[in-house]
């Protein structure tokens, strides 16, 4: 929850995040990862683009992975992405309190065939994928609880603007 979702990351932000990798990445590996992450954002484009809802904790909005100017640019990028009809951004402020799985970044991918749903957990050594019914039910419950504590889309945009003004 301390990083913004990869699909919403601005190129400079991606680079700053990967500079913190342990062990450190070679310049070539860093640029390769940046290029891949930036190209991956294309999934949000086009007529067949999926509808995506991103739940973002205030901690991720306030985490510093570079200079204030770059962070402002990243937050402005979030606002621009939230203008897309297939992108919904909802912020969970600190005031919402704790929630299950607070320490991990979770991607829940669902579609018309429920048996193909998958959960991706980002961990320091890579990603873990879960598809067992019990795991899916648990993570769906976690996300439902998080959604209850998040601001709506318009208040979330206002919140992001407020964070930008704090910089």
Task: Kindly label every feature range from the protein language model.
Residues 1-167:
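Hydrophobic protein-protein interaction segments
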